[in-house]
Curated annotation (Swiss-Prot):
Entry function: In the hair cortex, hair keratin intermediate filaments are embedded in an interfilamentous matrix, consisting of hair keratin-associated protein (KRTAP), which are essential for the formation of a rigid and resistant hair shaft through their extensive disulfide bond cross-linking with abundant cysteine residues of hair keratins. The matrix proteins include the high-sulfur and high-glycine-tyrosine keratins.
Subunit structure: Interacts with hair keratins.
Recorded name of the encoding gene: Krtap5-5
Any single biological process term in GO: hematopoietic progenitor cell differentiation
Protein's name according to its UniProt entry: Keratin-associated protein 5-5
Domain of life the protein comes from: Eukaryota
Keywords in alphabetical order: Keratin, Repeat
Protein family: Belongs to the KRTAP type 5 family.
Cellular component terms per the entry's GO annotation: intermediate filament
Sequence repeats: 35-38, 41-44, 47-50, 105-108, 115-118, 133-136, 143-146, 161-164, 171-174, 181-184, 191-194, 201-204, 211-214, 221-224, 231-234
Ranges for region 15 X 4 AA repeats of C-C-X-P: 35-234
Keyword field contains Iron: no
């Protein structure tokens, strides 16, 4: 019996041809041994010998023909063409990858720190990461929004997996904040519009001469001014005496 493209014998294992284009690593999927003539030569996908049908391996490159099928089981082919399903499921694929694999031939893995999102990579343990195959993480300061990164503790951050934070000056908008994670601020002069503010977070200002329109203002935040001839439109003054 001779090896593929080699002179000399191979022995029963067909290994160690050691020639260019021979059976060694170029077999790709036949493992350490190679197929010897007259059975068939190594193919890039799997070696064909009368062991299993070509259909179960997804077919050997170049066709099986007289080879009569694939050597051994699908597992010995080093991954069969046509997907893991034809090889018998996830088991024959060697299980799941270390980090939450979502492979077509594996079931979702249990949660591993290596597949957690950055904000949950530590502190919560195995139930932390917000992955498709993991449970939501508990709240950590590292995954809090900037405005709530301090002062509120673990219940601060406005994250999908965290409780809303309490109101802090650092996370309020400049004057009169209306943030989703803060209570409405009380009205401060610094956050009122120039004169008579009508902000959503401020009470209406009382009417001041400085914030009234020139004469007789009728603003939504000011009381009607006393009627003065100087501020009435021509011929339109309806001053009560």
């Amino acid at each position: 019996m001779t090896c593929c493209g080699c002179s000399g014998g191979c022995g029963s294992s067909c290994g160690g041809c050691g020639c260019s284009g021979g059976c060694g690593s170029s077999c790709g999927g036949c493992g350490s041994s190679c197929c010897c003539k007259p059975v068939c030569c190594c193919k890039p996908v799997c070696c064909c010998v009368p062991a299993c049908s070509c259909s179960s391996c997804g077919g050997c490159k170049g066709g099986c023909g007289s080879c009569g099928g694939c050597k051994g089981s699908c597992g010995s082919c080093g991954g069969c063409k046509g997907g893991c399903g034809s090889c018998g499921g996830c088991g024959s694929c060697g299980g799941c990858k270390p980090s939450c694999c979502q492979s077509s031939c594996c079931k979702p893995c249990c949660c591993q720190s290596s597949c957690c999102k950055p904000c949950c990579s530590s502190g919560c343990g195995s139930s932390c990461c917000q992955s498709s195959c993991c449970k939501p993480c508990c709240c950590q300061s590292s995954c809090c929004k900037p405005c709530c990164s301090s002062g509120c503790g673990s219940s601060c951050c406005q994250s999908s997996c965290c409780k809303p934070c309490c109101c802090q000056s650092s996370c309020c908008k400049p004057c009169c904040c209306q943030s989703s994670c803060c209570k409405p601020c009380c009205c401060q002069s610094s956050c009122c519009k120039p004169c008579c503010c009508q902000s959503s977070c401020c009470k209406p200002c009382c009417c001041q001469s400085s914030c009234c329109k020139p004469c007789c203002c009728q603003s939504s935040c000011c009381k009607p001014c006393c009627c003065q001839s100087s501020c009435c439109a021509p011929v339109c003054c309806q001053c009560k005496i």
